[in-house]
Amino acid sequence: MMEADRPEKLFIGGLNLKTDEKALKAEFGKYGHIIKVFLMKDRKTNKSRGFAFVTFESPADAKAAARDMNGKYLDGKAIMVAQTIKPAFKSSRWVPPTPGSGSRSRFSHRTRGGGSSPQRPPSQGRPDDGRGYAGYFDLWPYRAPMPRKRGPPPRHWASPPHKRATPSSLAHSVGCGMRGKAPTVSGQDGYSGLQPRRWAGPPHKRAVPRSSLARIGGSGMPGKAPAVWGQDGYSGPRVREPLPPCRDPGDFVPALRDYSRRYYGHSSVPDYRPLRGDGNQNGYRGRDHEYTDHPSKGSYREPLKSYGGPCGAAPVWGTPPSYGGGCRYEEYQGNSPDACSEGRSSEALPVVLPDAYSRDHSPKAYSGGRSSSSNGYSRSDRYGEEGCYEEYRGRSPDAHSGGRNSSSNSYGQSHHYGGEGRYEEYRGRSHEARSGGRSTDAHSRGRSDDAYSGGHDSSSWSDCCGGGGRYEEYQGRSLDANSGGCSPEAYSGGHDNSSWSDRYGVGGHYEENRGHSLDANSGGRSPDTHSGGHSSSSNSYGQSHRYGGEGRYEYRGRSHDAHSGGCSADAYSGGHDSSSQSNRYGGGGCYEEYRGRSLDANSGGRSPNAYSGGHDSSSWSHRYGGGGRYEEYRGRSLDANSGGRSPDAYSGGHDSSGQSNCYGGGGRYEEYRGRLLDANSGGRSPDAYSGGHDSSSQSNRYGGGGRYEEYRGHSLDANSGGRSPDTYSRGHDSSSQSDHYGGGGRSLDANSSGRLPDAYSGGHDSSSRSHRYGGGGRYEEYRGRSLDANSGGRSPNAYSGGHNSSSRNDPCRGGGRYEENRGHSLDANSGGHSPNAYSGGRDSSSNSYDRSHRYGGGGHYEEYRGRSHDTHSRGRSPDAHSGDHYTEAYSRGRDSFSNSYGRSDHYGRGGCYEEYQGRSPNAYGGGRGLNSSNNSHGRSHRYGGGGRYEEYRGPSPDAHSGGRDSSIKSYGLSDRYGGGGHYEEYQGSLPDAYSGDHDRSSNSYGRSDRYSRGRDRVGRPDRGLPLPMETGSPPLHDSYSRSGCRVPRGGGRQGGRFERGEGRSRY
């Protein structure tokens, strides 16, 4: 009988491999004071093995925890909690003999062998925790069959016999039909987690006559199996899990060799020497013993590194599996019979897995006596997590192949349901078939839902339903077909297919595909892709992480998406490349830079997303998702819906990458350097129509938190008749209402009669209300003229009588940022007056700057470098009434650094403004057009977290230069708001400050990794060209070192701060 003499100690099984001691203590600590938490870990990998022991101070607390927590979910997995138990006969040195056997059982190590009725699955042993707790290892059957190598059996199977037994005797002694009570396997303190009900071992001391062994190994021998013990005499509750019988007792004869201590030697007791039937199950023993090998016709070359046993499970090798998930297999290069061979002699131990039972046949593989490798590679971590799958190079009959060799869909589904798995590359041929050599994944007319290749390879659906898996590069040929040799996912007529690698999952990683791939549904055509013999990874690439998030995928080949008639709803390029829709529906994915040509077309060679007449298209890279990143696009792109025109983009041969994060949130669209147009019908778009001008409006129109990198062209929005419900500018540029409904983009709004309730500029530009309704988006700098008017050319927000207006960029929401405005801006409500600012014809950025994050939290507002007045009446401002003086800084013609630096975290929480270097017109300079470097460099990481951004060197209106060129903020914005991105440096002349039309080397070289290095370097250190200094300017330095310090006046390196003083700086 079993007793719980340590009721305060609990066994916790079935843990998620990510669960650690802290999580266990936090979860169970609510029931009472915990003395100790012991999580079993693999010695080699130091990863959790899926079970632990928690010792409470009070047995009552332990009992309550076991009652409440058993079966509950912890970190996504149902756990088992029970009190550890101890047998009535506690012994860590002796195992009672099997009753009626005439000899003592010697197999005290964990096995899954032993006689049992075929209706009872094997008991899967697992190593104990070094303290004798074997744990509940049979509760969740291990789904993956184990690959095997031939060779001598492991040394840790049992203690050596004193007399050599004949092979036949040993064969019978380990026969499958044996009915008996398994000997107790104890740990260091006598505890163990469970007791296999059916277990048999070899004789202990002397050879037993063949008849005796035959009786022991026979199927008719009743009896009880000894309990499996931990090293302190305790075990978990009985788990009555039967073991399937072996077909042929002669198929396996173990050579009795000691088990190596290199994995679990840390748990051995120095003075512990096993006696007779004693021995710990996976190397938790005091000393190793060398035993004489015994010949057998099914001998094994290498020691057993897993926890198998005769008959119940084939011995396996490689890193011991992490039960409950995380199994890792070593390479397999042979042929092995994974299922019963109907009495035929095989080269390896027949295995009956607990996954299914079908008339004594293996649920996974049945070879009709033919040699085949198991499905051991497949589904190695099918239900678990963090498994590592080593490469497989053999042939495997993973499904019922009628004697045909086939590798299972195990690769395609190595991490089918789990997370964090890793799938190594597969280079063989694979068939998963249930009948007639066809796959079990779809059992209809011998065809599979997932893969049927007619001899081709298939590794599709690598992380079909799971999350976090990684699909390493696939270099073979793969096909997916459902019926008639055609697949709802992929059919390539011999082409390769690795589509839909993470179709529904999250966080998967799809490595680059270098073969040909096609997807087709019926008639050789797919709802996703058909290329008429062209290469296609179709929606696989276009949608490698279609529904998930955080995936990343690179595409370097040619891809086609077509639905019917060679045309695709996603992409059709007439032989061109297509990698569109990379993360169309997902979130957080990363689309690596695309440098080829891509097209999207739906019908008639035209797509609702993109049609370029041979041009490139990578539009909609993160259309519906959030948080993804679209790396820089350097080709030409077009979007068109019908008649060569798209509701998103039509450029008459121009480039289009609009709508990069149209509906999503948090995505990033890296800088666009081409020309973009959007048009819906008749060459006109509800979003953008520019008559040949460029348009990148509405980049994040409906989403939130996305970023649209700088816009450098002309943009227009029009709906019908050249007019848009959002924008109408009579041919002028418009990027108003960028985040009218979402966050972060730019757009113009015009409602009716060419007038917009938000913006109407009578031909002027408008970028008003950039984040009017959204939250958290960012509006990149606007460099044109903008007006807002509601009726009669006047707007409830801004009217400037021809002046520019970017007022009220985020008046009502929180968290948005409005990038600096460098033109003229006025806010007026009625009669040309503004409730925020009216300057009597003077320039005004009104309260928009002052209120860029007025209502939100944590945002930063970039500085304004024009002349600004905030006044309510008589040219005076309610914010600061200084007689038309500037409220923040006024230097009477002197140069001054704006208070933008002084207020780097003026309104937000924890943000850091990088310092500004140069002379700035941020304050009132007496009307002088003094030189000024923009704050773009000062703000490379101004808004984001951990990102870097390289500078830009071209002519910019970023500072007031009296009509001269100055650098724009484009490079300053490459990763301006995001987190962790890295933008490669640019080499050219930097007009970042006003240099009198002279060229100036950018600071980009000093800052290519400027946040992680912390070096104070200016100029171009790679070329040794320092950045020229202007007379009267403060010393330049590396403002991106994250030191939080500013350079002292003396020009030293880090450590100092600017002094506050009159004329030079407000710090």
Curated annotation (Swiss-Prot):
Q: List the disulfide bonds.
A: none
Family annotation (Pfam families): RRM_1
Q: Does the keyword RNA-binding apply?
A: yes
- Could you tell me where the Low complexity compositional bias lies? 366-378, 400-416, 453-464, 530-546
What does the record list as GO biological process? mRNA splicing, via spliceosome
Which stretches are tagged as biased composition: Polar residues?
A: 600-621, 788-809, 827-849
Composition bias type Basic and acidic residues, residue spans: 285-304, 379-398, 417-450, 547-563, 816-825, 860-895, 995-1023, 1056-1067
Gene Ontology molecular function terms on file: mRNA binding; snRNA binding
Q: Where is the RRM domain?
A: 8-86
Q: List, alphabetically, the InterPro entries matched.
A: Nucleotide-bd_a/b_plait_sf, RBD_domain_sf, RBM, RRM_dom
Keywords from the UniProt entry: RNA-binding
Q: For the region Disordered, give the residue spans.
A: 90-131, 144-175, 267-305, 357-1067
In terms of SUPFAM superfamilies, this protein maps to: RNA-binding domain, RBD (SSF54928)
Record's protein name:
RNA-binding motif protein, X-linked-like-3
Species source reads Homo sapiens
